[in-house]
Amino acid sequence: MPNKFIFLLILLVCMLAGAFYFSFEQSPSSNQEGAELGIAQGAKEVDVEDEINDILVPDFSNYKNVVKKKKAFFKYLLPEIRRQNDLLRAERKLVLAMAEQTSQGNDFTGAEQGLLDELRIKYRVGEELSSKDAVAELIKRVDIIPPELILVQAANESGWGTSRFAQKGYNFFGLWCFKKDCGFVPRRRNTGTVHEVAKFRDLSHAVKTYLHNLNRHYAYAPLRDIRYQQRQANQAVTAKALVQGLKSYSERGTEYIDELLSMMRVNKKHMGL
């Protein structure tokens, strides 16, 4: 086995060792609520852990100058966004190395097969697929999300970081959970529904969960297909293209997409990209 592949395997072992420290399983109880809100079932649903540490998020409402507030908001989020995308790039390198193995007709070692099995679970790739087909599907799922898209979604979903969900629980992305006391009970929750707005331990946990949700939930297969098509055409992965795959993120559908595109145009100069 090439030295490069050995290095990538070791790297992924380290990454996967912590992968299940974050729990992202979809709850079946999301079905009713997803239908009521007009979004894909469970599209914004994640599991989070009950124990929440002391929270320290900048109070963005203190900014009187709108431009300064926007710049501060982006500056706060961007380093963690870049860090999580770097982790995805490293994981993707291993998947691409696996794809090269399968294209050459080489069998995986026991260790390599074990890592593939872990990735199947992490990214919800079906056991019925052959190793070659599973790797092909992972190539679609293990990839970055452009920072520009993450930043405008965070701004849109959290009111530029001023919502109580962002301030008290690092939830900048409007993600839900369904375990009792896993988050905040919405003030306007419909009778008979049980969802809560998720709390996260820290910004890293929140961004990681958001990215994981986009990369494996069936509702965002259109986003992953757009991204894959750009990769196949040797094009840059762009926020403007991928945003078209987010119609299931909000009950507002196309109107939500148009709003995000408008936010990109107006705010790109403030992002520091």
Regions found by a protein language model. Name each.
Residues P2-V152, N156-L273:
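Catalytic cores of secreted/periplasmic lytic hydrolases that degrade extracellular macromolecules
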